[in-house]
Each structure stands twice: as C-alpha cells, then as structure tokens.
C-alpha cells in the first residue's frame, strides 16, 4: 500500500472502514496495514505545516528541484507559480503545496476535474483533511458499535485510544509514559475547529471585498467560483467531523472539568446562530451528561461546583447569544436534577435541598422564558433535512418559534451522524426533563391554562407545546427509541403521554398529535398509538382514567364539528363563483389559525397511523360510526386553507397504501362523485342536492371538475397532495400478479358524465407540470411538485403491459377471458397510458422535462442522493427512457386502436394542445444541451442518477431517428454530427470523458462484487459506449469523442497533446482496466463479475479494431501498449475442476446459476482476444515487421521474452484449445414432461438471437404462464391441489427455458471461440517462417490437437466439425510431400514424417466414417471430400512416385508404399457401397460446391483404385472395384445422361466479368470459372478417368455416351455462332475460349472411350467423326491458320460484338493466347480420334481412287 499517495491511501482506508461499519469484514488485513500507515496523520490531526521562507525561496532557486520523500522532482516555472498560489490561498507551507500539486498531476486531477492545477490542489487539500477526519470518526464509531464482535470492537477501541487520543495500549504503558498527550487532544481539537472557522471567515471576507469591487466594476467575476464553493462546503464538513470526534472524546471520558469550562466560555462568546453552533450542541450535551448527570463520570460535589459555574447569573454569566445561555442552563438543570432523586443526597448535610430545588425550578422556568425551549426546538428542526419537510410540520414550528432567527440558507446539509448524535441527546434531555422535572411540566401547563382563561385575546406562553414538538423531532424516524413510550405502561414516558393528552387546549392538542405522529414510525409503534387513541385502549395500572384524554372519538367529533361549521358558512349557491368552487371571495382566516393547525395535526396523525399500521387503516376505513372519507371530503370543499386541504388528500392517500380492489373502487367512487358534484351531499342542503350556479345556470359535472381542477392547481400544497393521491390510486393493489392486466380504476368510471377513463385527471397533472409549475417560486417546492407529477406519469407508463397486446394476437390463450380487464380492447382504450403518451409529444411537456433535468451543477454537487433535486432529475430521465421504450407500441398498436374505437363509437375526446411532435425523439432533437447535462451528471457520485443518465444516453445514441438527424448529411458539405459539436463547446466533452475515466478506474469492492455501485456504473458506461459504437461503427459518434478521438466529418484523428495522445483518455482507461484486471482467485476460482467486466471492455475494443473508421488508430495504439502480450499473460486455462463463482461446470445447477453467464462471457472474451491476435499477426506480416512477428509466435508457442530476463512461460495456442470438452452434453438437455402445460404455445416468447438461434424471453413466458393460470382459475377445475400442480409445472418450465437459453448461448459462444481459434491457427499456418523439421513439427502439433475433437464432433456437431475440418484441410494442403531422396532426410524429420503419416491416415479414416454416415451439412461434407482427395493424391500418390524413383526403389520403401495404398483401399472398401452412395448422392443432389468436391473425390478414388495394378499390367486393363460399384449404383448412367444438358449448363451466365481477375490467372485459363463450370469440369474429368479404363469405357459407352452427346448438340453447334449474354459482361473472346474448353474435354472423353476398348468401338468413333465432320474440319483449319487469322477475327468480334466488358490490351492478348491453345488442344483430340479409328483410311476406302495431285497438303 506504500505506493498509494496520501489522498488515495486515505480513500482506501475510508472504504475499508465503511465496510466494517456495515459489518463486512473481508478486508481486515488490508485495513490493519492502511491504519498503521496513517498513525502520524491521525496524531497530527489537521494541523497545517507553517509557512517557511526557506521553502519558499527554494522553489525559486536554480536549479529548480525539490525532494519529497525519496523522490526528487524538477520544477518548471508554471508549477512553481501554482505552488506559490496554492500556498498563498491556503496559508500553507510551500513544500507541502508542492507535494499536493505533484499528487494532483500524478493522479490526473487536471484532466478529471477540468480545472487549473492550483485549483485541483485546493480541492485535494480539503479532500485529504476531510477523509482523514472521516476515518477518525469511523474508527470511533466502530469502537462504540455494540453490534459487532466484541473482540473486534475492543481492537478498534485500542486503536482509537492509541492512534487518535495518544494513549498507548495497556501492555505498552509504563510510569514514564503516562497518557499526558490525552490532556492535549481536546484543546487541540478545539483549536483545529477554530482554525476551520477562521479559514471560512477569511474566505468570506475576501468574497465580500471582491463583491464590492465587482459592484464598482473594478474586477471581473471569479472563474473559480465552483472551487470556492467546494472549499466552503468542505470546511463546514471538516468542522462537523471535528465536532463529532470531540463528542466521542467526551463520551470516552477524555475530557476534564477544565475542558468543559473552556467550552462553556467559548459558547458564552458565540454571537451567531449558525451551522457551527449546531455542530457543538451534541458536544455540549455530552459534556452535560458526563459532568452534570448521575449517568456520567462526575460526582455530586463536582457537579454542584459546575452548577454554580453554569447557573451563577449576574454580569459574569453574560452570553453574546442569551437564548443559547438559557438553553445551556435548562439542559444542565434537567440533567443535574437527577442527582437529587436518589439516596445520595442524604450526604449533603447542612444544605436546604428544598430551597435549592425551588431555586433550580425558578432557574429552569426563567431559562424557558428566555427562550431555552425555543432554541432547542430550532436546533432540532434545523438539523433535520429541510428539503422534504412537510409544510404542515414547518407551520407548526413557525407557530411556536419566536425568538430564534432562521438558520442561514446555505447549502450545508447536516450529516447523518450529527443528526443521530443530536437526536440521541435530545432523547436523553426529554427523558431527563420528564423524569427529573415533573413538577415543572405540571406548572407550565397550569400557567398556560390560566393565561388562556385570564387573557384569551393575548399571546400565551407555549413552552409545553414546544417541549412536545421537541419530542417529535427527537423521536421522528427512530422507532426503536420511540418504543420506550409504548413498552411499559407504568413508565414515566407512558405516564407523560397520558397526562399530556388530558384536557388539552387547542395548541396543546395540536402539539400532542404532532408528537404522537412522530412516535409512530413503524407498524408496532403505530398500532400502539392507535390503541392509545381507542376509548378502550390500555392505560396505566389504575393511575389515571382516560375519560378526558385525546381519543379517536374526540378527533372524529372535532372533524365533524368543523366540517359542519365550515360548510354551513358556505355562501348560498347562486352567489358562488364558478371560478373558485365553494370559495367565492372566501378568506382562509374564517377558520381560526389554532383550529386550522389542530385540524392539520389531526389529519397528519390519521395519515401517519393509516400508513404505518394496517390495523389502524382498516379501523379508519370500516368504522361504522364515523365515515372518515365522507367527512373530510365535505370539509375539503369548505372555506379552508390550502394546507388543510392538502392534509385531507394525504389522509385519502394513506388510506389507499395497502388497498384492496374493493377499497380502490370505493375510493374512486368517492373521488369521482366529489369532483363532479362537490356540494350535493353537504349538510344543510334541503331537499334535492343542490349545485352551485353561475349567472343563473347550474354547472354540469364536467364544469364542476374543471372548477375543482382550477382550484387544486393553485399553490403548491394542495396540487402536490392531490397529484400524490392520484398516483397512489393508480398503483395496483397489493397481492396482484405482475401482469398489470387491469386498468387501475373501475371501468365504468365517468360513464354517466363523460368518456370512460381518467383522462381529465391525466390532463390536470400535465397542466400542472407544463404550465402551473411556473407560478411556484420556491425551488424546493417546485422540485417536489415536479417530482409528484413525474411519479404519476411513471406509474401510468410502468403499469401498462404492452406484452398483452402481442400475446393476445399470437398465443393460443383466450386472453379476453384470462385477463382481469373486461377484454384486451377495453384495457388498451381505458388505460391512462395512451393519454400520457399523447401528452409526452407536447412541446411544453418536453420543455418542462428538459427544464427539470437541467439544473445548476453547484446545487447538484452539494445535494444528497435522496434530495428532491436529485430524485426529480432521476424521475424525469426515467420517464424519458420509458417513453422511448414504449413509443413504438403507442404509435403502431395503441393509438390506432383508440382512434378506431372513437370512430366507431362516435366519441371525441379533448385533444392535447401543442402536440407538436410526431415522435418523442423530435423533442429531444430540439434540446441538444440534454446530452451535455446527462454527461455531466455522471460525475456527481449519485449511482442511480448516473445509471439512468447512461441509459438515456444509450437510448438517444442508438435511436435511428436521432442518428439520422445528428449524423452528417451527404447533401451538405461540412455538416458534422450535431451532438459532437455540442460536446465540443467549452470543452464539455473532455470534462465528461475525464469523469467517465475516473469512474472506470474506480476501485471495486470485492466484498460487494456485482452489487457495488462502482461496478454497476462501470457496466453502464461500457454498455452505453458499446451500444453507441454498434449503432454507427463507421461514422464518428459521441462515443468516439468520449473515448478520446478527434472527430472530423467522416474520419477520426488524434489531437496532438490531447488526452489520447497523452494516454489519459477514456480509451486508455479501458486499456488499463484490461491490463490490470485479474479474473481468477486461488480460493474462489473465476469471479464472474470480473469476467463480465473484462468482456464488456473487450467488445468495445473489438468494435473499434474491426471498424475501418478506427481500426488503424486502435491497432497502432494496442501494439504500442503490448496489449497482445498482456492479454495472453492474464488468460486462464479452463479446467474441469476450475470453479466459477463456486460452481463447477460439471455441476447440475451450473446452467441455472449466474456462473454460467460468466462462463459464456469468458468464452466470448477469449474469442475477441484470439480475433485481435489474428488481425495483429496479419498486420505485422503484411507490413513486414519481423521482430514483432517473432515475439507473437513465441508468445503463441508459450513463451514471452521480456528484455534480458528469463522468458515467461504461458500456455500456448494449443493449450488454449481447452474450451472444447466433449463430456459436456449441453445440447442434449431433455424436455420435461408436462401434463397441464403440454399444449401451451410458447411461440410469442421466442426470439431469434443473432447468434444462438431460438431464444426464449423468460419474462414473456412467465406472463403466458400467469395468463394460463388465470384461465385455469376461472374454470371449474381450479382446486387447490390442481393449482399447486400447475405451479410446480410452471417452475419446471421456467427452469428448463432458462437452462435451454443458457445452453444455446454457451454453445454459440464456444463455437465463436472455436472459429476465432481456428482462424488464428490458420493465420499462423499461413504466416509462419518455419522451415523443414520445425514446420513439420508445428503442423503435426496442430493436427494432434484437433484430431480427437474432430473425431468426437465429426458426425454429431456439424458447426464445430466444420471449423476443425477447415483447419485440417489447410494443414493437409500445407504439408510438403515432395522429397528428392531419402538421403536428404535426417532422423528427426523421418520420425516426424512417420507420425504425420499415421495422423493423416487417422484423419482420412475419420472423414470416410463421417461421409458414410452422411453427417453434417453439405459444406462440411465438401471439406471431408477435399481432405480425402488431398490424402489420396498427395500421400498415396506421392508415396507411389517416391517408390518409383531409382534412388528409392528399395524393398523397404516399396513395401511401405504397398502397405499404405493397401491400407487406404482397405479403409475405402470397409465402408463399401454405403460410402460411395453418399458421395454419389452429393455429386448430384447437393449444392454446387459439395457436388464439385464429391466429383473430384470420386475421380481420385477411381485413380487410386486403378493405380493398384500389379507390375507389368496396364492400369487400363485392371478391374477396378470402385468403377464396378459406381456402375451398380447407376451413377455412371446418370453421369452420362447428364451430358444432354451440358451445353446449356456450361454457357449459363453465372457471374459477371471482372478484368482485374485475369491478371492473377494463368495464361491457359485467363478467366476464373464459375462454380457451375467447375462442377462440369470435375464431372468431365471423372468421365475421362472412367473412360481411360477398359472397364469404365465399357460402362460409359453402354450408357449411350454418343447418344447423349448428340442430344446435347455440343458438337453440332458452330463455336463462332454461339451467342453471348451481354448482361453477363463476358467478352466474346472469353466466351469462345470457354466453349472450346468444353469441346476439348468432351473430345478427350470420346477419344479415351474409343481407344480404351481397342477395336470394339472403332465403328462408333468413325460414326462420331462422320456426324461432326464440319466441326472437325473447321477446327483443323483454324489450327492450321487456314481461313483467316484467329487473333484478328477474335479481336474484331470482341470489340464489335456488343459486349459491355472493358479489357486492357494485355487482357486481350492473354485471352487470344488461351483461345488458340484451346483450339490446338481440340485439334489434337480430334487427330487422336481420327488416328485411333483409322478414319482417314476408312474414308479413302469409301471413295474411288484418284491420281495424286502435286503439292498435296496433309493436316495433322
């Protein structure tokens, strides 16, 4: 850990301490090391090194060098200036400033933060102090944690004493080394706090001075305002941490009386109510408990002396803040009075205890009059987070708080540990006050009652109410502490509750309800509070009757009374204003403020109990004596304040927390009736229900709703509360399945007054969100209101199940009967999803969404993750994501259905105003700043917000609509990607990229593994980059820019001195992750989450190196970083016993666990690595870089050489062939047997995976099962036993689908890896420089590696076998079988050759076996055919050639050749007709490639069979069993018969002409033949081979060879008149050459057939020549040059023949040469036939003899 810099070491220590604080103890050894390294830092606290003139001067001296630790640094002028600036800014030693700046530069803070170096130094300085103090605080917290192991707690206690307080462990103490330093810690801590306050004051003074100069326009605004704001916030946090440490020191008994007195003296001089004062209140409470309470360490005498010091009064007790002094005295007296309640006071002789008691009572009451409770209440309230504070609670506080100014409104939230410690001490204060001062509390109540009676119109003291509110703050959110009020009914606290609830005044009742609400923060406490309010609730054992206590009955009576009162005072209906229903000219002051507050507290208490306690909720809903809902709804339409109406809505919301369907329908009925006719059932109305009227007209239900919405839309409280009520009503009831197959309201809702559904409510929410939020001035209220609206929108979106539409059309389930809604059409029409989506295309709504997201970065930086600001941004982003996901469903399925229904039913709903966009993306395109905002928010440290931002960026970056708008337009030059341009402004892209780099490089917590925030953020970043690159890999995107590339119009570059050039880009961060990542551990094996991380990074790099846009840049950079060798070093071999997240691959649960996903990712990552190595090897071979090429081959052969060191041994390329294990039968997973689900149609949940084929959507499958189960439940067979069996089958089916999916993915990943491995091996085979024996050894090693697997897969797994056979084929063709003589063979090469011969024969047998089984695809069998052909022609024939040479004509070689050939023929014979049958079938019934390969193999088989003749016997005369077999199979007859269509097949246009190809062709064949012509050539070659044997010629002629040729018309057509298809682009000269080539092949077949059988077929040969005399004569003339020049005619025809092909002069010459060669070959073939048949002699005998002419010319 010594290589960590100071801040990074503190951060590492902090992370380990946080883990222990969370009871995770995996890193204790690391923690111990880190803790030991910080010992000196703990002892120094945050003391700053003093300024030193020598150090300052040393920075300016030449040479400018500085030594820090053991390192010496050379300094430039800019660095020195930054050092001096930092030292001046922080009043810090110059050398320490240099150390901080060096750390900043080393850690890349300038790039990460996009700030000047000195500002980064300021931030690092404060971070170091903050982390140091936080670590000290955490150590003290752990030492006080009683929930951890006692031994561990003791160890941390010893560490705290030693390293923080300077007290050595007991075993190290001696008399000379007594803990004297402990006496200095508290003063040092106080001094440090004073220093923090001084720094902050200095900053404030500078800011004020600068503001004055700015106002006078003398200076410009600061550029480093964000840094200053961070410094201020950090200083406040440091002060808070110091206060917490000081608090722990006091609690651990390290304080003295002198320390306490000094502390009180400091408080007496404190003149401002601010954050720093609140930080000290827990310390004050700890001091009081320590020295003034019987629970502390002080004795009574000591406490009495301190009592005189604190409560002495007079001028000596003057306080700059009198209310603070009053609070100190009150707190002290409450605690100190505990000394006088037990027997110890009997030792105080001569003291009048009663007089002292009266004096303390008087002092306490005087303190209250001076504002003690007021101050404590302010501290308790201000310490709580204000952002979520309910306005009602704030109103109660403002009503009681009168003497304390408000806390400065600065963004300095109090930490959770300060809040906790303060509330714990407030709990102690409350307990002490109730237990030690009961008479004082009674006196307070008596005095307040007397004041209310004697002076009802004057302001009364409300200290008792303040005390109750203090209790509420102290216990709010702490249900375990609140149980002390409920556990023991005879306790002081329980007695206080009963006493406070009796005969309470209106203000006291309000405060009591608020206190009771805060004492009900969980179900147990809330139920206890509910029982307390029941008339029959438990009471203290006989001490007090509850007859006059606060009960539910009293609360209900009060509500009924005020409802009647408020509604009876409502003006007459004709005078009511239609604009404000029920409140025409109303003044909220018509209800007394105290009464309104009491009603608010009643309602808040009801809402709390209903929320927390199901018993209370049921009682409130089902109470037969009091209809709560009816009463409060009547109250809501009266003349009441907005805040009271909001409380009513919160009660209704609470009643629906754990609602049932029936309760939900009833609530909707109440709300709908109340909205459409609010005054119909109010008390006081006589006869029929009345409606308000306007200008003599009675408004209808819709007008009433509009008026109510206008009323609720004003202000924050009631609109926010009403929207939250609507949201709760839309949340599905608990206990429902996850189908969301019903609308969240009664389907009949609105049927009598408007269109069905809740469209008016949706419109109201969006109206508030888009329009009325502009009227909210308070930022906190605006955020909360927006969040409430967005929560409503989100619920409407997520509760719509789009899959039901698909399942309804594709599955065999009767979905209308199965789903909860009436039918699918009703569900689609009524669900609020359609209306919400319609609103989301509104311009104002999208603008409000963008405004919600776009916030001040400074405010965001200081906001907590659960603040309204952060949560509202998060929800807005989530809404946008959901809208993009569901947009297609809405546009193509839902909206057409809604419009169709409206057209059929004649219903027309109110259109959405300003629905300007046809797609949601159009709104995003109008706000490009959104991309920048989303990128910036990724660096705030809020994990959920970061994940959402990255997800939305991914959606935006992959949207085809947005991509088409952002991408360059080919019609306009210079139009770059708009998003890239936006990110380039002000360097925003570099800032975002740096923040993403920091997130990528953040350390992972091994204990949290995949659940850690850092890990999830890393994956989100990688997924975003991958999706963006994959969408447009060949165009510059924002992903390229963020990775560090310089994006131009259509290409990428590297900016000089930019992040990429300096290797500080996000791309290099990804590289660093891969290079440093270790995915395996000795004990746990492969860590799945790390494997996944590695694969996600690799696939991004894979896209980059494959894309032409970025390939060259990326390949060069990867080569420069030795990426290839790092990957091979980190690669782990796959072993059967290697665990994957604790699971073995052979385990039965492997495919059901997430370990299988890690295994799949590992295979994919290795495939990517092999792909890269193959690409790199090709690159270095083509670019001729032999040194790197040699290094790569060494690495692939198992050795990496590093400089002059010994080579590192790693697995070789053949060792990495470890992923193929034939024992794993993943593809043979049997299907389970089902009884009830056997006919289930899973077609709708089948997805076509890009690589894995059929893939099941598990979520859709679960939905299908849920629908099927509901279908069963509706039937009569749905017994419990039946449903249990169905549920069991469902579980089995889901598991089987999961296993099937993962097995397919695994097999696909394995196949992809095999392809990559095979491709890499082929590249190695092609590019290696091996010669002779090393080459043979390498090829043998490769052959040995693949043969066992190929043998296992040859007939079972065609895809895997194809890849291996491909390698085997290349290996076979690469083997050099030509040997000049045995004398040139050394012993080693001879041995290798023998081994290869054995392996090749094994390969040959394997292929024969697979062929005979007709295994695999035609492509695979064509490979088998090629391998067999190569073996026969190269191995067997070559051996025969070697044996025939004189130098090798010894007995040994001849015998081996005979054995080899015999062994080969024996193997062929072993498979018999079965083998030949498959080959013959493929020769005619497969694709062209396989046909050709089969024909070629048959040719080789015939040739090999012929070559086995005995010595001295002509091969033509030997019987060939292969030929007999072919004849038995009727193959020869079919072969000959196929010649009838040979001319059409040969001339069929199968490809276009490419002149460039001719340059690579041989002169004899300038144009490559098409696959069909290749097949025809192979077929003719086989015929020729057959006809060269007497046996074969017989079978061919018997098959009517001449008749087939006659019918084909090949020899009957004049080659010069053959038509050429102009569309084929083949020049005529080329077409002629091809035609003549066909004639040559057929003529040779005829000649061989005639000559092979001697005189038997002469007649047929003569007849053939006679029939085609014209062609024969024409060819012979052509060949002799008679009748015109061949070249000239051909050139003219090729130029003027209408061909569209363009040929160069060289191409023309080559084509003419080929044509002439074909003509010459055809002439030779005819002459051979003429000679063999004696055709000329025969002809001469048939005509009369003539006198010979002179100069007779003979044609040859």
Swiss-Prot record:
Q: Which InterPro entries match?
A: Nup186/Nup192/Nup205
Q: Name one Pfam family in it.
A: Nup192
Chief location of this protein within or outside the cell: nucleus
PANTHER family, alphabetized = NUCLEAR PORE COMPLEX PROTEIN NUP205
Q: What is the protein's quaternary organization?
A: Component of the nuclear pore complex (NPC). NPC constitutes the exclusive means of nucleocytoplasmic transport. NPCs allow the passive diffusion of ions and small molecules and the active, nuclear transport receptor-mediated bidirectional transport of macromolecules such as proteins, RNAs, ribonucleoparticles (RNPs), and ribosomal subunits across the nuclear envelope. Due to its 8-fold rotational symmetry, all subunits are present with 8 copies or multiples thereof. Part of a tetrameric NUP192-NUP170-NIC96-NUP53 module.
Q: GO terms for biological process?
A: mRNA transport; nuclear pore organization; protein transport
Q: Where does it live in the cell?
A: Nucleus, Nuclear pore complex
Its recorded name reads Nucleoporin NUP192
Named from the GO MF annotations, one term is: structural constituent of nuclear pore
Which UniProt key words apply to this protein? mRNA transport, Nuclear pore complex, Nucleus, Protein transport, Translocation, Transport
The reply to whether RNA-binding figures as a keyword in the UniProt entry is no
What does UniProt give as GO cellular component?
nuclear pore inner ring
Return the similarity comment.
Belongs to the NUP186/NUP192/NUP205 family.
Taxonomy, superkingdom: Eukaryota
Summary of the function given for this chain in its UniProt record:
Functions as a component of the nuclear pore complex (NPC). NPC components, collectively referred to as nucleoporins (NUPs), can play the role of both NPC structural components and of docking or interaction partners for transiently associated nuclear transport factors. NUP192 is located to the NPC core at the nuclear membrane and is essential for de novo assembly of NPCs.
């Amino acid at each position: 850990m010594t290589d960590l810099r100071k801040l990074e070491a503190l951060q590492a220590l902090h992370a380990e301490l946080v883990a222990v604080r969370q009871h995770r103890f995996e890193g204790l050894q690391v923690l111990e090391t880190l803790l030991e390294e910080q010992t000196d830092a703990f002892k120094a606290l945050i003391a700053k090194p003093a300024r030193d003139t020598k150090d300052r001067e040393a920075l300016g001296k030449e040479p400018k060098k500085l030594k820090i630790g053991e390192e010496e640094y050379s300094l430039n002028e800019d660095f020195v200036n930054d050092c001096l600036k930092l030292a001046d800014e922080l009043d810090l030693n110059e050398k320490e400033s240099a150390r901080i700046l060096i750390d900043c530069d080393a850690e890349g803070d300038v790039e990460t933060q996009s700030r000047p170096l000195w500002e980064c130094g300021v931030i690092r300085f404060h971070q170091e102090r903050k982390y140091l103090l936080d670590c000290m605080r955490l150590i003290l917290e752990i030492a006080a944690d009683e929930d951890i192991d006692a031994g561990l707690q003791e160890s941390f206690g010893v560490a705290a004493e030693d390293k923080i307080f300077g007290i050595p462990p007991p075993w190290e103490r001696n008399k000379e080394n007594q803990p004297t330093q402990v006496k200095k810690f508290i003063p040092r801590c106080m001094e440090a706090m004073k220093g923090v306050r001084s720094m902050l004051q200095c900053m404030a003074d500078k800011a004020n001075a600068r503001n004055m100069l700015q106002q006078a326009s003398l200076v410009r605004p600061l550029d480093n305002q964000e840094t200053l704001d961070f410094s201020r916030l950090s200083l406040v946090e440091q002060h808070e941490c110091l206060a917490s440490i000081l608090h722990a020191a006091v609690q651990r008994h390290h304080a003295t009386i002198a320390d306490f007195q000094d502390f009180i003296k400091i408080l007496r001089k404190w003149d401002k109510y601010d954050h720093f004062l609140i930080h000290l209140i827990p310390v004050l409470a700890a001091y009081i408990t320590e020295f003034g309470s019987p629970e502390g360490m002080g004795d009574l005498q000591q406490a009495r002396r301190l009592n005189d010091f604190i409560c002495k009064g007079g001028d000596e007790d003057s306080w700059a803040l009198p209310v603070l002094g009053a609070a100190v005295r009150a707190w002290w007296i409450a605690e100190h009075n505990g000394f006088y309640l037990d027997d110890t006071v009997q030792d105080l002789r001569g003291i009048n205890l009663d007089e002292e008691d009266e004096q303390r009572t008087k002092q306490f009451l005087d303190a209250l009059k001076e504002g003690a409770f007021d101050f404590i209440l302010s501290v308790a309230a201000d310490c709580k987070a204000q952002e979520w504070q309910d306005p009602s609670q704030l109103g109660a506080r403002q009503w009681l708080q009168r003497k304390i100014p408000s806390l400065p409104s600065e963004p300095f939230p109090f930490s959770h540990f300060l809040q906790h410690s303060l509330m714990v001490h407030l709990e102690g204060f409350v307990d002490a006050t109730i237990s030690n001062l009961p008479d004082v509390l009674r006196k307070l109540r008596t005095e307040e009652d007397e004041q209310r009676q004697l002076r009802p119109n004057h302001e009364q003291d409300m200290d008792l109410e303040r005390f109750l509110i203090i209790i509420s703050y102290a216990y709010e959110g702490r249900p375990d502490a609140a149980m002390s009020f409920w556990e023991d009914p005879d306790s002081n606290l329980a007695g206080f509750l009963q006493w406070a609830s009796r005969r309470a005044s209106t203000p006291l009742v309000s405060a009591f309800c608020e206190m009771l609400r805060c004492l009900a923060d969980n179900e147990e406490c809330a139920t206890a509070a509910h029982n307390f309010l029941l008339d029959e609730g438990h009471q203290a054992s006989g001490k007090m009757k509850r007859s006059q206590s606060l009960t539910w009955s009293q609360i209900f009576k009060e509500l009924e009374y005020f409802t009647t009162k408020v509604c009876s005072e409502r003006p007459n209906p004709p005078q009511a204003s239609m604009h404000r229903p029920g409140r025409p000219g109303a003044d909220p002051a018509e209800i007394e403020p105290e009464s309104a507050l009491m009603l608010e507290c009643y309602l808040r208490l009801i809402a709390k109990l209903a929320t927390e306690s199901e018993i209370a909720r049921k009682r409130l809903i089902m109470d037969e004596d009091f209809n709560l809902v009816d009463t409060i709804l009547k109250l809501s339409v009266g003349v009441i304040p907005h805040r009271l109406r909001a409380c009513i809505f919160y009660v209704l919301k609470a009643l629906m927390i754990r609602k049932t369907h029936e309760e939900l329908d009833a609530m909707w009925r109440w709300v709908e009736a109340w909205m459409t006719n609010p005054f119909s059932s109010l008390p006081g109305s006589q006869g029929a229900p009345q409606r308000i009227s306007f200008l003599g007209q009675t408004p209808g239900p819709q007008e009433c709703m509009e008026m109510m919405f206008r009323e609720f839309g004003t202000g924050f409280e009631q609109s926010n509360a009403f929207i939250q009520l609507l949201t709760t009503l839309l949340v599905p009831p608990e206990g429902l399945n996850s189908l969301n197959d019903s609308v969240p309201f009664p389907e009949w809702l609105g049927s009598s007054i408007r269109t069905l559904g809740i469209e008016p409510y949706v419109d109201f929410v969006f109206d508030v969100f888009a329009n009325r939020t502009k009227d909210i001035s308070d930022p906190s209220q605006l955020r909360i209101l927006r969040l409430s609206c967005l929560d409503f929108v989100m619920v409407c979106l997520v509760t719509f199940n789009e899959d039901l539409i698909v399942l309804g059309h594709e599955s065999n389930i009767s979905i209308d009967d199965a789903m909860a809604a009436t039918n699918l059409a009703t569900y689609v029409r009524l669900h609020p999803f359609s209306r919400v989506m319609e609103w989301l295309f509104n311009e104002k709504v999208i603008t409000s969404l963008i405004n919600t997201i776009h916030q001040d970065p400074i405010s965001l930086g200081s906001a907590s993750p659960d603040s309204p600001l952060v949560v509202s941004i998060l929800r807005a982003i989530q809404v946008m994501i959901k809208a993009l996901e569901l947009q297609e469903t809405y546009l193509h399925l839902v909206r057409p259905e809604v419009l169709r229904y409206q057209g059929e039913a004649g219903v027309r709903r109110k259109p959405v105003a300003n629905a300007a966009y046809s797609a949601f993306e159009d709104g995003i395109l109008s706000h490009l700043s959104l991309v920048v905002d989303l990128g910036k928010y990724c660096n705030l440290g809020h994990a959920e917000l970061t994940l959402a931002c990255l997800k939305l960026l991914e959606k935006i970056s992959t949207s085809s609509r947005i991509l088409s708008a952002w991408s360059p337009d080919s019609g306009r030059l210079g139009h770059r990607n708009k998003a890239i341009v936006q990110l380039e402004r002000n360097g925003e892209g570099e800032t975002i990229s740096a923040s993403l780099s920091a997130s990528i490089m953040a350390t992972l917590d091994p204990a949290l593994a995949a659940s850690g925030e850092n890990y999830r953020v890393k994956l989100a970043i990688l997924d975003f980059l991958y999706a963006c690159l994959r969408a447009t890999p060949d165009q510059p995107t924002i992903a390229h820019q963020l990775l560090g590339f310089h994006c131009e119009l259509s290409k990428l570059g590297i900016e000089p001195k930019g992040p990429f050039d300096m290797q500080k880009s996000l791309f290099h961060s990804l590289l660093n992750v891969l290079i440093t990542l270790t995915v395996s551990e000795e004990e746990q094996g492969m860590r799945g989450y790390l494997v996944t991380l590695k694969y996600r990074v690799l696939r991004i790099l894979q896209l980059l190196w494959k894309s032409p846009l970025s390939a060259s840049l990326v390949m060069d950079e990867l080569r420069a970083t030795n990426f290839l060798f790092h990957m091979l070093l980190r690669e782990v071999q796959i072993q059967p016993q290697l665990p994957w997240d604790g699971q073995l691959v052979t385990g039965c649960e492997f495919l059901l666990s997430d370990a299988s996903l890690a295994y799949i990712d590992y295979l994919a990552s290795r495939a990517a690595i092999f792909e890269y190595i193959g690409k790199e090897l090709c690159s270095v071979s083509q670019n001729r870089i032999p040194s790197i090429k040699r290094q790569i081959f060494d690495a692939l052969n198992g050795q990496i050489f590093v400089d002059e060191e010994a080579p590192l041994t790693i697995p070789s390329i053949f060792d990495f062939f470890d992923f193929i294990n034939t024992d794993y039968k993943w593809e043979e997973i049997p299907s389970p047997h089902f009884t009830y689900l056997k006919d289930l149609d899973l077609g709708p949940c089948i997805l076509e995976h890009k690589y894995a084929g059929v893939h099941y959507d598990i979520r859709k499958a679960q939905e299908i099962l849920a629908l099927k189960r509901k279908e069963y439940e509706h039937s009569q067979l749905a017994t419990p036993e039946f449903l249990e069996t169905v549920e069991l089958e469902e579980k089995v089916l889901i598991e089987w689908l999961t296993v099937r999916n993962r097995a397919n993915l695994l097999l696909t990943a394995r196949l992809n890896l095999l392809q990559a491995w095979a491709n890499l091996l082929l590249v190695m085979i092609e590019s290696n420089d091996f010669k002779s024996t090393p080459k043979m050894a390498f090829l043998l090693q490769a052959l040995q590696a693949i043969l066992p697997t190929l043998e296992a897969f040859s007939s079972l797994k065609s895809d895997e076998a194809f890849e291996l056979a491909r390698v085997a084929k290349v290996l076979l063709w690469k083997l050099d079988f030509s040997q000049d003589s045995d004398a040139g063979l050394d012993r080693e090469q001879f041995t290798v050759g023998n081994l290869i011969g054995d392996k090749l024969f094994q390969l040959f047998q394997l292929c024969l076996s697979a062929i005979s089984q007709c295994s695999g695809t035609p492509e695979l069998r064509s490979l088998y055919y090629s391998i067999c052909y190569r073996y026969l022609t190269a191995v067997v024939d070559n051996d025969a050639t070697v044996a025939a040479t004189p130098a090798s004509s010894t007995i040994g070689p001849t015998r081996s050749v005979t054995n080899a050939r015999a062994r080969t023929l024996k193997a062929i014979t072993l498979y018999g007709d079965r083998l030949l049958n498959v080959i013959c079938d493929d020769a005619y019934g497969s694709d062209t490639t396989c046909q050709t390969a089969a024909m070629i193999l048959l040719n080789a088989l015939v040739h090999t069979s012929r070559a086995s003749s005995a010595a001295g016997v002509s091969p033509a005369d030997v019987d060939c069993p292969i030929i007999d077999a072919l004849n038995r199979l009727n193959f020869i007859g079919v072969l000959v018969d196929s010649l009838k269509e040979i001319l059409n097949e040969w001339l069929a246009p199968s490809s276009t002409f490419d002149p460039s190809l001719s340059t690579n062709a041989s002169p004899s064949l300038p144009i490559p033949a098409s696959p069909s012509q290749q097949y025809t050539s192979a077929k003719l070659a086989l015929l020729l081979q057959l006809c060269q044997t007497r046996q074969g010629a017989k079978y061919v002629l018997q098959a009517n060879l001449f008749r087939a040729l006659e019918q084909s018309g090949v020899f009957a057509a004049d080659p010069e008149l053959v038509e050429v298809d102009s569309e084929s682009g083949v020049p005529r000269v080329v077409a002629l050459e091809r035609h003549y080539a066909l004639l040559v092949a057929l003529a040779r077949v005829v000649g061989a057939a005639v000559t092979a059988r001697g005189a038997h077929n002469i007649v047929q040969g003569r007849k053939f020549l006679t029939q085609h005399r014209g062609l024969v004569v024409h060819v012979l003339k052509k060949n002799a040059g008679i009748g015109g020049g061949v070249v000239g005619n051909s050139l003219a025809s090729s130029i003027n023949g209408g061909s569209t092909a363009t040929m160069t002069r060289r191409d023309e010459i080559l084509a003419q040469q080929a044509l002439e060669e074909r003509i010459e070959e055809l002439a030779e073939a005819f002459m051979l036939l003429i000679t063999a048949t004696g055709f000329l002699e025969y002809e001469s005998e048939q005509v009369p003899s003539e006198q010979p002419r002179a100069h007779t010319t003979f044609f040859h």
